[in-house]
């Protein structure tokens, strides 16, 4: 997660429980280094997260600083770059622009920092239809178009996809109990005994059956 507690990281490293860690800040890199040294671990794989302009991840300057000062992290392996800007993206244009931006940054790192990330973890944020009547995604066409974009990149390392909603959304149903029903100003409402945290995102209501 975004918040990493030292005690938790120490426990995970002691149990050999994580193959790869993400770092959201330079402070987290230092924390991972401290915990790895204490656990006697070397080559701990880390993905540094590049921000998309929000509270998550690091800006380009901090990532370049982590590469420049990688000697300060002798127990860590800066294996790759991680990037995720959000979900429910309509069309492929934003995804294409994001990947072109990432490719340009990776080119800069390789050419000017004498360093090359081996991996890129990218969350495309493919859109999933939640409401009745919404157009269903043609997955084959979508993925073929996405593949063409990936094939055009200069980056030739390993690319991992973070596609949680795209994979998980069709795989289950949300069941809850109607506790009360009412009508207010011509609108029908049901009061249910379930939460709403999983049906709201970025101010949008996501309908669930």
Regions found by a protein language model. Give the residues of each.
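The start of beta-strands in P-loop NTPase/AAA+ ATPase cores
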Residues: 44, 116-118, 124, 157, ...
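Glycine-rich beta-strand-to-loop/alpha-helix junction loops that act as flexible
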Residues: 85-87, 120-127, 163-166
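Alpha-helix-loop-beta-strand connector modules within alpha/beta enzyme cores
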Residues: 43-47, 102-104, 142-154
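Oxyanion-binding "anion nests"
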Residues: 121, 146-147, 160-161
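Active-site-proximal beta-alpha core segment in soluble small-molecule metabolic enzymes
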Residues: 1-119
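Charged (often Lys/Glu-rich) extended helix/loop segments that serve as interaction or gating elements
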Residues: 158-209
């Amino acid at each position: 997660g975004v918040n990493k507690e030292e005690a938790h990281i120490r426990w995970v490293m002691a149990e050999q429980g994580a193959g790869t860690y993400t770092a959201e800040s330079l402070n987290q890199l230092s924390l991972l280094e401290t915990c790895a040294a204490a656990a006697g671990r070397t080559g701990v794989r880390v993905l540094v997260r590049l921000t998309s302009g929000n509270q998550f991840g690091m800006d380009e300057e901090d990532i370049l600083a982590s590469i420049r000062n990688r000697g300060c992290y002798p127990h860590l392996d800066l294996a790759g770059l991680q990037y995720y800007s959000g979900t429910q993206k309509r069309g492929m244009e934003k995804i294409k622009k994001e990947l072109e931006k990432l490719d340009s940054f990776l080119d800069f790192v390789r050419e000017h920092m004498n360093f090359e990330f081996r991996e890129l973890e990218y969350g495309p944020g493919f859109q999933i239809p939640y409401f009745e009547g919404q157009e269903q995604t043609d997955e084959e066409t979508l993925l073929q178009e996405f593949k063409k974009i990936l094939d055009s990149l200069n980056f030739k390392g390993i690319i991992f996809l973070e596609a949680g909603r795209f994979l998980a959304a069709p795989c289950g149903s949300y069941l809850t109990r109607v506790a009360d029903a009412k009508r207010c100003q011509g609108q029908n409402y049901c009061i249910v005994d379930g939460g709403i945290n999983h049906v709201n995102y970025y101010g949008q209501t996501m309908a669930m059956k």
